[in-house]
Amino acid sequence: LSDQKRIIYGFDSFEGLDEEWISTDYNPKGKFSLSKKQPNLPKNVKIIKGRVEETLENFLKENKNKIVFCHLDLDNYSPTKFVLQKIKPQLFPGSILLFDEFYGYQNWKDQEYRALKETFKEDEYKYIAFGKRQASIEIL
């Protein structure tokens, strides 16, 4: 984030989860809300406020650059699948995708993991790193 020459784009509603999510505990719709308040961020970080399903398509039409890195912290299947389908044409060999809640909790195979498996063939990516629940892939 400190490289002021590169613009980092983020998408957030600041309203929390748009549907319930069960990890190790129950997280109801709206959990993780920031009460629509945007945090203070460096000048090179631009936030597109609103639900990603309502903001991403127009952003991608206006910004046709290739996507080098995408951190997906959408928790649930539906928004993750939506984003993956929309950004796929702008990915290239070497693009990195980081999934924040990829595995290691109840029903994980029905969420971000499922969205990845339904959007990409096995030979289109490789796993490059794993964290507690996170996974990173590189587009081939």
Where is each model-derived feature located?
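S-adenosylmethionine/decaboxylated-SAM
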Residues: L1-L140
